[in-house]
């Protein structure tokens, strides 16, 4: 029995303990709907075809569902279609009726974690995982933001994902992280929060090119949780990246990634069909 969660039941959120023992099937999942912050400061989603709500997918059982039904008694448990990188699935989700949301504040991104991330009021550092052209600093220098990225943590590993090239552009593809059970490498940066503004613009977040996501990263024998990265929204069949973009990736890979993975990534890019 699959359950889609989008708010306080997600990893590292205050009600996640209610899912103790439930295996996470997908960290990156979405349903058609609209996400809100209630007048009590809590997340609530209503079903709608006009937008997406992002969350996680878990394998649960009847006993856990009965417990959650009691906890979320003010919500309706509905069967929903869930989009994941592994294909479409059907799951339950706890949602509210649209007419209950009149006084709520809509969350434009559809992602509770991202909403909380952007609302932060402190100036704590941000950890960011780059797997494509942001492994290289050439465009950082051009934009005058290279000082933000001057002290990377270093090469890093992400389990459960693969680097793919699913974003199509007129001159070729751009990189993406796909949750397919693989293993990939990239660069982990420690940044001031203001660097997020540059990254959001570069990744085309407002244009719905990439979306922010938060993943677990291993670097230097340490696990970093809730690390910012960016995922392609409209994934297409893979084609080869253009030469100038591949050069950026290769420069970063040669500098930070393991030689074996760097070579594997180069071979993979060269194996993709050209436009």
Stretches with model-predicted labels:
Residues 1-275:
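Glycine-aromatic micro-motifs
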